[in-house]
Amino acid sequence: MKSVGQHFDEWAPNYDAEIREMVPRYEEIHDTLISLLSVRPPTRVLDLGAGTGYTLLRVVDALRETRVTGLDVSAEMLSRAAQRLAGHEDRVELCQGDIVEPAIEGSYDAILSVLAVHHLWSDQKRHLFGRVWEHVSPGGLFVVADYFRHASALLLELYELPEADAHEAAHDHPDTTAEHLTWLTAAGFDAVDVVWKYEDVGVLVAWKANR
């Protein structure tokens, strides 16, 4: 079985075209994310699972004073991110690493993760959320845009694919939005909410109060 990194290395050449076919309202997800960040424009943003850099590009285009760091396990995805973000090198840092145990240094006004957290098991999500809380600045936020498992058996039947491919079965582990909100609260975030949802994709936000 391929690792997540190997899978995304192979998928990188076709990722940008295919992800828009796979994820409903992909652009709307990013519009929601930018709207959240624009309320109080952050100075420093970290993107966990940055992929080919589309989210980072949306951030640097919309928020001209913001510096961004992107972390991804796939060298091929990061290579494409570097190409996409050419011209913004003074505001962008790209790092290879695994979000299971991310090497996060310093603090960030906002930490993002788009379509990456569902690759983690439940206990890994809980651990990651605790790590993220430690590195979000007081007054900052954590945004998770991802697939979420439906809590209702009827909705699972309506929206879930009848058979998963080998990668999905081995590496995709979505949990419900309610479980995510519970874990984010347990990690220490002071306010958590679902701010956008369509079928099995959604955007969650967790705020850390000023202290």
Where are these regions (language model features)?
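A short acidic, Gly/Pro-enriched loop at the edge of an enzyme's catalytic core
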Residues: 103-111
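Residues lining the SAM
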Residues: 113-117, 145
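A short glycine-rich, Lys/Arg-flanked "PGG" loop and its adjoining helix->strand segment in the class I
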Residues: 126-138
